[in-house]
């Protein structure tokens, strides 16, 4: 996954 996607997923979690 891209860094941006990872950050978004982390934010949701």
From Swiss-Prot:
GO terms classed as biological process: defense response to bacterium
Entry GO terms, CC: extracellular region
Tissue: Expressed by the skin glands.
Modified residues (Leucine amide): 13
Keywords: Amidation, Amphibian defense peptide, Antibiotic, Antimicrobial, Secreted
Subcellular location: Secreted
Family: Belongs to the frog skin active peptide (FSAP) family. Temporin subfamily.
Function: Antibacterial activity against Gram-positive bacterium S.aureus.
Name under which the protein is recorded: Temporin-1BYa
Native organism: Rana boylii (Foothill yellow-legged frog)
């Amino acid at each position: 996954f891209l860094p941006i996607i990872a950050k978004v997923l982390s934010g949701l979690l």
